[in-house]
C-alpha cells in the first residue's frame, strides 16, 4: 500500500462525518437536490441520519476489503456457532435474548461491533468475491483507502472521502447490491452520477488532475457476483454541469438561509 499523498488527509470516519456542518459532501448534495430542507436539518443535527442493516453490512465490507483483515478483526466480532455459553440446567446454549448470553457476548466482543454469523459469512463472501475478480482486485492492488479531500467550489467548502484512491487508475467506489443486473437502473435512481462527478471535481481541484471514476459493485447474496463500472466522458461531463448548478443553488440557499421542500407550489398530475 502506498503512502498517502500530502493533499489527501488521513482522517477517522467520525471526524469526517462530524464536519458535515462545515463541508458539503456528495451525499449532502444529493440530499439537497431531493429536498433542501431535509439537507439543512441533517446538516444542523436536527434530523439524525438514518442507518440500516444494509449500511452496517456495507461499512463492515469496506473495512475488510479496503483496510484489511487485521483492521476488520479489531473492529468486528462474530459469535461462531458452537462457542455460545451452555445452560447447565438444560444442556443447551442460552438464548440470544437472555442476560447470560448478552453478558457473554459483551465480554467476547470487547467493544467491537457484533456481526451475526450469517452477516459475517456475507461480508467474508463478498470480500472473497472482490479479491477473485480480476478487474476489481487490480484496481485495489495499489493505492490508499478512505482518503479525504477538502477544497472550495463556487465559494462552498466541500469534502469527499474516497473509498480507494489508486494513483495510476483513479477513484474507486465500493458498493453492495441485491442484483448486479439492476446497477444501471440504480445508478440513475440514487444519483450515483452526481456522486461520481462530485468526487472527480473535488479531486481535480485538490490533486490537479482529472481522475477516472470506477464503481466496484458486489452482490450481497451468493454467488456474490462482482462488476466494475465506469462512466463515459460525455455522461460524466453532463453530471459535472449538474453538480456545478446544484452547488450554485446551494450557495444561494446558504446566503439567503432559504431551505424549501420543493413542493411549495401546486403541481399538476397528468396532462393539461
Give a label for each model feature.
Residues 39-43, 176-180, 221-225:
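Short acidic (Asp/Glu) and glycine-rich catalytic loops that position anionic groups and cofactors
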Residues 65-70, 153, 176-179, 204-207, ...:
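Hydrophobic/aromatic-lined pockets within catalytic cores
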Residues 1-159, 264-270:
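Metal-dependent nuclease catalytic cores that hydrolyze phosphodiester bonds in DNA/RNA
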Residues 135-141, 166-171, 204-211:
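Secondary-structure boundary elements
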Residues 53, 57, 195, 239:
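Hydrophobic (often cysteine-bearing) scaffold residues that line and stabilize catalytic clefts
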Amino acid at each position: 500500500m502506498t503512502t498517502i499523498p500530502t493533499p489527501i488527509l488521513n482522517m477517522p470516519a467520525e471526524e469526517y462525518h462530524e464536519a458535515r456542518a462545515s463541508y458539503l459532501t456528495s451525499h449532502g448534495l444529493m440530499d439537497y437536490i431531493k429536498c433542501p430542507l431535509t439537507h439543512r436539518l441533517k446538516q444542523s443535527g436536527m434530523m439524525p441520519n438514518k442507518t440500516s442493516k444494509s449500511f452496517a453490512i456495507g461499512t463492515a465490507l469496506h473495512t475488510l476489503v479496503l483496510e484489511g483483515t487485521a483492521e476488520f478483526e479489531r473492529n468486528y466480532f462474530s459469535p461462531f456457532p458452537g462457542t455460545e455459553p451452555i445452560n447447565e440446567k438444560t444442556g443447551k446454549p442460552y438464548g440470544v435474548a437472555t442476560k447470560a448470553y448478552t453478558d457473554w457476548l459483551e465480554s467476547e466482543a470487547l467493544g467491537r461491533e457484533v456481526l451475526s454469523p450469517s452477516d459475517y459469512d456475507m461480508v467474508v463472501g463478498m470480500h472473497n468475491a472482490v479479491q477473485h475478480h480480476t478487474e476489481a482486485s487490480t484496481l485495489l492492488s495499489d493505492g490508499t483507502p478512505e482518503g479525504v479531500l477538502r477544497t472550495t467550489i463556487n465559494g462552498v467548502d466541500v469534502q469527499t472521502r474516497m473509498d480507494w484512491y489508486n494513483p495510476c487508475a483513479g477513484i474507486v467506489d465500493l458498493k453492495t447490491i441485491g442484483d448486479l443486473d439492476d446497477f444501471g437502473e440504480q445508478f440513475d435512481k440514487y444519483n450515483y452520477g452526481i456522486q461520481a462527478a462530485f468526487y472527480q471535481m473535488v479531486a481535480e481541484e485538490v490533486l490537479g488532475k482529472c481522475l477516472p471514476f470506477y464503481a466496484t459493485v458486489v452482490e450481497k447474496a451468493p454467488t456474490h457476483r462482482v462488476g466494475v463500472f465506469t462512466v463515459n466522458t460525455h455522461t460524466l461531463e453532463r453530471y459535472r454541469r449538474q453538480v456545478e448548478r446544484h452547488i450554485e443553488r446551494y450557495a444561494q440557499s446558504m446566503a439567503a438561509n432559504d431551505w424549501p421542500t420543493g413542493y411549495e407550489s401546486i403541481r399538476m398530475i397528468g396532462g393539461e
